């Protein structure tokens, strides 16, 4: 997990000002998203996938844009996702 975290951190160095509050350890926060809060607005990357994320093609955990609650698993299709299963839907709260 540490290696994956390092790769994602290097690939997504920018931190988001939205969706950054997390009840879990800061070690689980990568790029512009946190595990508990999903993602940032716009084209921010999701955790292990997400909106145009590093592992978007593999799906998995992906933060949705403007998400405030929960972890978005998988996600929908469309320009917001970056892939069929990677990432989530805009303004989505909860577990998708």
UniProtKB/Swiss-Prot annotation:
Gene that encodes it: hssl25
Domain of life: Eukaryota
UniProt protein name: HssA/B-like protein 25
Coiled-coil residues: none
Organism: Dictyostelium discoideum (Social amoeba)
GO term, biological process aspect, one: sorocarp development
Family the entry assigns: Belongs to the hssA/B family.
InterPro entries, A to Z: HssA/B-like_chaperone (IPR050533), HssA/B-related (IPR008455)
Pfam families xrefs: Coiled
């Amino acid at each position: 997990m540490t290696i994956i975290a390092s790769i994602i951190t290097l690939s997504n160095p920018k931190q988001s000002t939205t969706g950054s509050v997390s009840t879990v350890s800061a070690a689980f926060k990568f790029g512009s998203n946190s595990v508990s809060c999903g993602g940032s607005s716009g084209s921010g990357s999701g955790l292990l996938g997400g909106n145009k994320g590093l592992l978007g093609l593999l799906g998995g955990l992906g933060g949705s844009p403007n998400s405030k609650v929960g972890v978005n698993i998988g996600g929908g299709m469309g320009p917001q996702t970056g892939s069929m299963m990677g990432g989530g839907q805009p303004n989505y709260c909860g577990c998708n």
